[in-house]
Amino acid sequence: MSLRLKNCIISLPRVFQGFKRLTVLFLKRFSSTDRDIQNLLSFCPELTNLRLSSFEGINCLNIQAPKLESLHVDGDFEEINLDAPNLHEAILSTPKAKSYQSVSVAHDKEGYVKLPLGSLSEIKTLAIFGFMKYLSKGCVLMKPPAVFTRLENFYLAICFWDQRQVLTACSLLQNAPNLKKLHIRSDPLSTRDQDQVSIQGLTLEMQMDHLITASMIFFKGLDYEVDFLAKLLSCTPALEEVKIEWMGEMDRSMVLTKLLALPRVSPRAKIIVT
C-alpha cells in the first residue's frame, strides 16, 4: 500500500490510528511540525520506503521505522535522528547545513555532528549532499563516528577548495572498507576556509581494496581535484575505471596530461574524461 501527497499541510488529529498497512510514503512540497511528522511515521509500522522533499516547518526529523529500507530526504532541516535498523539506502540532502555549521550540540563533547552517521553504519548505499562543510566542523576529521562495513555505493558532494571537506571525505572513505563504487560531485566555491591544510599527509593510510569504479562530475581541473584523484589512484588496487565529467574553463589538454600521468596502483585502472 502506498501514499503519495504533494502541495499539502500534514496536521494530524488528536486521535490518530495511523496507516497500519502503508509500505510506501512520498511527501513533496508540504509543511508540518516536528511532532506531527514523527507521529505520522511512528504509526506506519510496515513502512519500507520513505521520501520527504521540499518541506518547511520541520527542524528535527525523528524517524522511527523498524522496517524502513530506503530513505530519501531533501529539504531544510537542522537535525535528523534515525531508528531504522533495516535501512539499506539513505540519501540525505539539505541546503541549510551551511547555515548552522558552527552550532554545537548541547552536552556533546565529541563535536558538532547532528547527522547520525553511527545509525547509518549498516547500509549499502549512502548519499550525502550539503553536509560536508557541516561535518568538517565537527568530530569526523579526528574520530569518525562509524565504520561502514556494508557500504558499497557512496555519493558525496565536496567543495575541493575547502580542504577540511576533503579531509573529512578521506576520513569517511577510510572507514568504508568494502566500498565498490564512489560517486563525487565537485561543488563550487562558497566561502573559502581560512585554515587550509594539505591532503598530502593525511590520506597516506587510506586504503580501499575493493573499489572498482569511481566518478567525478562538474570537474573543473583544479589542482585540489587532481591531487584527490592522485590519492585515489594510489590506494585502490582493484580499481578499473575513473569517469570524469569535464566542466572546467582551464586548458583542458594541460589538465588531461596531468591526469594521464598520475601513477596507479591498479594496472587495470582507466581514466575516461567526457
Identify the function of each model-found stretch.
Residues M1-T274:
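Non-core capping and flanking segments associated with repeat-based/extracellular domains
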